[in-house]
């Protein structure tokens, strides 16, 4: 009996997405409005990546070339062809509105749901950001955090060799700090 319920994604319960549909229908029946958050990779984002020229490059394609990675195959299986795709389509078609936090998610939904998709950017309080660099450093420090299971999706498989090449050419001018699979809870 709430006026507004916001779902963070079709995977709003820790169940397979298609198993959340009975809970979604319950929420629709007993609450005023239900809004879907477009906050990550889902059916409509993948659809925009695979079926349109909306993005010049994405997790799934660069130009017309599909990025054939194990992670992409797994993601496509559920979020583009499987139960998560069905749940996303069902919720997006019947919810009262869709809120996207990033431009790429906004345009993915805007293509099909222009009347109920809104861009609500992530808030960043610029007054709380203080620059720590007071002078030009003698050594440039690069930090690269790598999630091994997502390195090809996030591009760290490409960025790390480039950073290493820069360091080989200029060992006295740069340093690399490389970490792997650091939990988000730290």
Regions found by a protein language model. Name each.
Residues 13-16, 42-47, 53, 106-110, ...:
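Short catalytic/ligand-binding loop motif for oxyanion handling, primarily in non-cytosolic enzymes
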Residues 36-81:
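Acceptor-binding helix/loop patch of EC 2.4 sugar-transfer enzymes
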Residues 157-185:
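A conserved nucleotide-sugar
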């Amino acid at each position: 009996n709430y006026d507004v319920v916001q779902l963070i994604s079709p995977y709003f319960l820790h169940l397979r997405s298609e198993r959340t549909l009975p809970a979604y229908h319950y929420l629709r029946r007993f609450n005023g409005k239900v809004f879907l958050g477009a906050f990550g990779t889902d059916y409509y984002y993948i659809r925009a990546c695979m079926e349109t020229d909306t993005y010049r490059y994405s997790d799934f394609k660069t130009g017309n070339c599909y990025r054939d990675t194990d992670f992409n195959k797994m993601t496509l299986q559920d979020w583009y062809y499987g139960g998560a795709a069905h749940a996303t389509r069902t919720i997006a078609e019947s919810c009262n509105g869709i809120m996207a936090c990033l431009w790429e998610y906004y345009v993915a939904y805007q293509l099909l749901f222009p009347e109920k998709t809104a861009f609500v950017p992530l808030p960043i309080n610029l007054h709380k950001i203080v620059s720590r660099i007071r002078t030009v450093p003698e050594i440039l420090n690069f930090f690269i955090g790598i999630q091994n299971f997502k390195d090809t999706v996030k591009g760290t498989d490409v960025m790390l060799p480039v950073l290493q090449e820069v360091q080989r050419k200029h060992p006295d001018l740069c340093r690399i700090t490389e970490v792997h699979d650091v939990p988000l809870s730290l």
